[in-house]
Amino acid sequence: MELFPELKNIKVPTEKSRLWKDECCYCFDTPENGEGLFIDLIGLLAFSKKYVQLNHQKTHHHLYLNFKKVAIVNEKVKSPTIENGGEEKPPKKLAIGVEGGFNVEDEEIKYEEHYKLYIFPDDKFLELSDPIIPENVRVCCEKIKTLNSQSRKEEIVSWNAESVFPSAFAESIIQLDNNTKKIDPKGPWRCDIEGCDKVENLWLNLTDGFIGCGRKYADGTGGNGHAQEHFNQTQYPISVKLGTITKDHADVYSYPEDDMVSDPLLFQHLTHWGLNPNVMVKTEKSMAELELDQNLNFEFGKIQEKGKLLENVFGPGLTGIENLGNSCYMSSVIQMIFAIDSFQTRYLKDREASFKDITQDPTQSFEIQMSKLAHGLLSGDYSIPLSKPSKNANEESEAATQIGIAPKMFKSLIGASHAEFSTMKQQDAHEYLQYLLEYIERAEHSRPSWIQQANPTRLFQFHNEDRIECGSSGQVKYTRRLENILSVPVNLDDATNKQEVAQYEETLKQQNGVRQKDQEEIRPIIPLVSCINGFVEPYRVEDFLSPATGVKTFSLNSSRMATFPEVLIIHLKKYTYNADYTPKKLNVFMDVPDIIDIDSLRGRGIKEGEVPLKEGTINTTTKVPEPSFNQEVLDTLLSMDFPLVRCKKALLATGGKDAELAMNWIFEHTEDPDIDIEQTPVNNNNNNNNSSNSNDKLFVFNSQDVDNIIGMGFTDSQAKLALKNTKGNLERAADWLFSHIDNLDELVAKDNASTSSINPSLIPQSTTSLQPVSDGVGKYELLGFISHLGNNVTCGHYVCHIKKNNRWIKFNDRHVQLSEQPPKELGYIYFYKRQLN
């Protein structure tokens, strides 16, 4: 071994080292596959046996730690349950497939781990105890055995960020000295209110020992709300749910904080009332389990096509994706895009060439990880039936029927530059799809020279035509911008079953708003065609400063599609906000046709008889008028105790019409050093050294955002132009710059030359130089759809259905089945492919 020059370069890794040991860099083999994985002792990257030679060719490294996991035959550990007296840890968050989420584990397979030193190209294995191994090599191997892999480290960081927080009231509770009252830890318990017969869903108030029933559930079960009433009368702040108390966990609720909390002194508070958590067992469902049941039961039954025995399917293109912890939003998007031929060709054809010639760290190469992903999904190598369906611990909503793939490296790489997608939280699949397409678009600018296939994201791109009609002059202006997703409104007025919905709601009203256990839920049925037609409906914008007349009026704005893409993505705006700005979902059923014709949406530019809107100018020697604000929206923000200057800045940056958008802007920019500095829009175009036009003065720039972009190598003018075109969103501004990198100077020059007086925050953005896109007829056939189960995008579960070879396939994590009646009515994002004939 003294022949190997890298011996002196082998250093013992630390907790800070970037170590990948659970997934091959070039394929989805794991330590459980074949001969296991081979971990480069210098690079700390893992490879399956077939790719060790490739790594050696690139690095000239000879020494690897062979890591192999072997299942223990016929030895399975049954998870303890309520029924068998064990202590089942309940979920702490409303989520499927996460640690602390809904526990769906039935059986857990145990593994033995085996480690050996491997020498390449000698193809020689050595036991780690072999005296021939140098000490520094042995210590390095032993350390690798104990360290967490990079994916595991990122997971731990994310979970720590999502912990339940201690109550602010817990340590100040003064428990009443009631020596006569002790709670029997074994029960039975009953609500203390006379005449109340509730013996479940009971909450013990930690201050006075009062036992009260909880709230009533949506199906009519639950309690009568006596625990809440007791707090209203006494203001005693914290209660614990009886039946959920174990030595490791209890459901603790703080009434003043209106949230589930932790109590650092819970053991002390419980023993005061005679309860010893060390000997208590769980006998009731936790609040997270109950809420999950309520939110998912109805929709999940439809997604699963309840009552039907669906056939499991295997083979190329039928590979499931392991839930990495609330990663179903990512999986559903990945499955959909790789069902499209152009994505398959783009990332499969030159896969081996990319593996061979890209010298970059493979875990940091988007080209390598996308090619790896394409092969993993499409080859069929991992679409292998399990001998018995099983569920990974805290990972999947349905028993997996195949090995599938676990794209941990891909998730780590894509999420590294995004604050939300790097976490284990549930995300919006629409936002992730948009982010991924922009990521691919940027990567295509620097793709390897040997790749000749077209940029696959161009399939989705189309030119959107925006029309502005001046309310006073009737003159019009047409602009175009590049889009890749058609987002359409969901209007409840378009429901085709209004009478049935009204009858159902009246029945619910008579039942005090509680749906009976076996009562069918009636939802509004909205035709998808109505949503598409709603996209072109004009809307009125107030406080429009007309360039034609020079006075404020209103404008009528509308949009159409100037071109039709090869693949049309339709996103439903199903998610809105309650009056308190908490997100909510419109619970509707969609009427979705397999074939749609959208030719009526085509925009053809200025029409005969229309007069183009004249571009006015502003007197450069005068102060630009103070922008006006929608008083109702401004009052809404002020009522939330935001300072006036912050409210005005937020309204300027977000368009001035949406209080929720403005509120989010304020929260996102709270730490800005100039957040409370008044900025008066002054036109100083007389300064010849000023490279920004007057529109810059109407747009409030965050100086820190501008500096961040300049730090990336862009100029001040380029940074401000990008921020204007993305309404101040820093991440989108960076994306915008990279996607327009080829003609940035031209765009800046045209922007500087512009003298339009139209407030850019009140009109659609105009892209002065659009890249060409494909166009064709507007007739499309449904290719697939992504469904979301749950009440909002921050919780629940995503599933996708894809039509392959005239068969509908359901992809639910690693459970892949034929779908007999695909629940198209539950879709959130629909993919339509243009009909060739």
UniProtKB/Swiss-Prot annotation:
User: Any keyword Hydrolase?
Assistant: yes
Which reaction equation describes what this protein catalyses? Answer: Thiol-dependent hydrolysis of ester, thioester, amide, peptide and isopeptide bonds formed by the C-terminal Gly of ubiquitin (a 76-residue protein attached to proteins as an intracellular targeting signal)
Keywords on record: Hydrolase, Metal-binding, Protease, Repeat, Thiol protease, Ubl conjugation pathway, Zinc, Zinc-finger
Q: Which GO terms describe its biological process?
A: oscillatory cAMP signaling; positive regulation of gene expression; protein deubiquitination; proteolysis; regulation of protein stability; sorocarp development
A GO molecular-function annotation: zinc ion binding
- Answer yes or no on keyword Membrane: no
- Active site feature: C328, H797
Q: What does this protein do?
A: Required for development but not growth.
Name-wise, this protein is Ubiquitin carboxyl-terminal hydrolase A
| Gene, per the UniProt record | ubpA
